[in-house]
Design a protein with these regions (language model features):
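C-terminal substrate-binding subdomain of Rossmann-fold SDR/epimerase-dehydratase oxidoreductases
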Residues: 17-23, 30-31, 55-58, 196, ...
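N-terminal Rossmann-like NAD(P)+-binding domain of SDR-like oxidoreductases, especially those catalyzing
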Residues: 1-191, 256, 262, 266, ...
Length: 351
């Protein structure tokens, strides 16, 4: 039985990855920090099937101890301070977890007597590209006539989070080439799910819709039968949905599809770096259209307020990943469409 050690198991990706590994017969250990609040909500249903180990990714001694004690065949690092906006407010914390933590894992693997038997996955981010992109190409019957990012696009990070992720990305490549560590990086574009944190714009939208429907005392069917909501009229005593840049475009996929790519990477004979994306880009406005339509609201303009405080410094306004390498070498392909992703998130928050 293979053993997997997951840093960041209580997050969106960690919970889906743990489920996938359990389905494939792994012995799964998840690393959590000792905190005063319960953080295991996303993995509560699988707690009897996994081992939870206390540890701190920012503490090298703690990481060394975990690698030595649990003897993993595969190590997945999904731990990070992953909110871009928060990284501007807490850059030091973001660096310590997102970059420093990766160095601690790599050093622990490097000095482990089982170094050659351990495979490491690092969650890199499309935010590393910043505002940079390539434009237009045609290869083997595939034509892209728009701005895009792939494994060859230059990284120009625009936030403390992206800078820390890029440092970690380069560290993995350096340890792979310099010390022979089997370390792969998934350059993950935006991926959401019903388990997405409420501080992310997609979940903020679907959670608000769920609360609004419940406040009205109706449900999806009621909205479809109530024409007053099609005009965008809303009671003044219900707080409106406050958002930032509605025209920012992202390549959005479902987290379940993306954790499958992680697993496929560590199973490759040779380690490498892969863009994991859908190859489609949509704006926040597009997300709103589909989300509100799910509950029968055609005109949401009077329900949403643009609030400048949600604009970020050095805003990245366009991300579109081309996952050709992952599709060819890993045999990976996304299964959940953008529309289905939005519907699943809305439906979950309506429950």
């Amino acid at each position: 039985m293979k053993k997997a050690l997951i840093f960041g198991i209580t997050g969106q990706d960690g919970s889906y990855l743990a489920e996938l590994l359990l389905e494939n017969g792994y012995e799964v250990t998840g690393v959590t920090r000792r905190v005063s609040v319960n953080t295991t909500e996303r993995i509560h249903h699988i707690l009897p099937k996994i081992t939870i180990a206390e540890g701190d990714i920012t503490d090298g001694f703690s990481v060394n101890k975990l690698i030595a004690e649990y003897e993993p065949d595969e190590v997945y690092n999904l731990a990070a301070q992953s909110h871009v906006g928060t990284s501007f407010k807490q850059p030091s914390l973001t660096w310590d977890i997102t970059a420093g933590g990766v160095l601690n894992i790599l050093e622990a693997i490097r000095y482990s007597p089982r170094k050659d038997d351990i495979r490491f996955y690092q969650a890199s981010s499309s935010e590393m590209f910043g505002k940079n992109f390539d434009e237009g190409f045609s290869s083997k019957g595939i034509s892209i006539d728009m701005k895009y990012q792939d494994e060859n696009t230059e990284f120009i990070p625009q936030s403390p989070y992206a800078i820390a992720k890029l440092a970690a990305h380069h560290l993995v490549r350096n340890y792979r080439e310099g010390y022979g560590i089997h370390g792969s990086c998934g350059i993950l574009f935006n991926h959401e799910s019903e388990r997405r944190g409420e501080n992310f714009v997609t979940r903020k939208i679907t959670k608000w819709i769920g609360e609004f429907v419940k406040w009205r005392g109706g449900n999806e069917v009621d909205f479809l039968q109530d024409d007053v909501y099609h005009t965008g009229i809303v009671a003044s005593n219900f707080p409106k949905l406050r958002l930032g840049n509605l025209d920012a475009k992202r390549d959005w996929g479902h987290a379940e599809d993306y954790v499958n790519a992680m697993w496929l990477m560590v199973g490759q004979k040779e380690a490498g770096d892969y863009v994991i994306a859908t190859g489609e880009t949509y704006s926040v406005r597009d997300f709103l259209d589909i989300a509100f339509a799910r509950v029968g609201i055609d005109d949401w303009s009077n329900l949403v307020v643009i609030d400048p405080k949600f604009y970020r410094p050095a805003e990245v306004d366009h991300l579109l990943g081309i996952p050709i390498k992952a599709e060819k070498e890993l045999g990976w392909k996304r299964k959940v469409s953008f529309k289905d992703l939005v519907h699943r998130m809305v439906d979950s928050d309506l429950e």
